[in-house]
């Protein structure tokens, strides 16, 4: 991937969903998407939009399940993980490494700061910042 950065302003949850839908069209299996941002800034909403574009229903926050796997009709898996409640040892026990670069999945990780062995190849970083109660800045960095 080429290094690039795009900044979007979302004014509502619907805007964030739509941005996720559009972003999904740019994804290829094997990519890891790292989602940075405080609680409530739209990370899971964005992934739900990706899921909708992939024809995956019922994308929910993995805050308590830690990892959710969804299979699209095309056979590509959407893997969605939330590391918020884990320390480094707990993250390693999840086995996320098996999804890195996998030819049949895209991996989304919320709170990647908690992941010591964070991947560096084929990674997209997305930063969510609350500008107001409803407005979000969403910065997408491809490396």
Describe each PLM feature range.
Residues 43:
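Conserved lysine of the Walker
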Residues 56-70:
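Short beta-strand-centered segment that lines the nucleotide-binding/catalytic pocket of NTP-utilizing
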Residues 38:
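P-loop (Walker A) phosphate-binding loop of NTP-binding proteins
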Residues 2-22:
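N-terminal pre-Walker A segment at the start of P-loop NTPase domains
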Residues 24-30:
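Phosphate-binding P-loop
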Residues 6, 89-143:
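Short phosphate-coordinating micro-motif centered on Lys-Gly-acidic
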Residues 33-35:
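Hydrophobic anchor at the beta1->P-loop junction of P-loop NTPases
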């Amino acid at each position: 991937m080429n290094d690039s950065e795009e900044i979007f302003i979302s004014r509502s949850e619907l805007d964030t969903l739509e941005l996720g839908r559009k972003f999904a069209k740019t994804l290829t299996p094997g990519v890891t998407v790292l989602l940075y941002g405080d609680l409530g800034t739209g990370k899971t909403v964005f992934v739900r939009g990706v899921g909708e574009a992939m024809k995956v229903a019922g994308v929910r926050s993995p805050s308590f399940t830690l990892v959710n796997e969804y299979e699209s009709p095309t056979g590509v898996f959407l893997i969605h993980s939330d590391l918020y409640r884990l320390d480094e040892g707990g993250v390693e026990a999840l086995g996320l490494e098996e999804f890195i670069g996998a030819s049949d999945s895209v991996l989304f990780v919320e709170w990647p700061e908690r992941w010591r062995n964070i991947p560096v190849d084929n990674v997209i970083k997305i930063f969510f910042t609350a500008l107001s109660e409803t407005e979000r800045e969403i910065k997408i960095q491809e490396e």
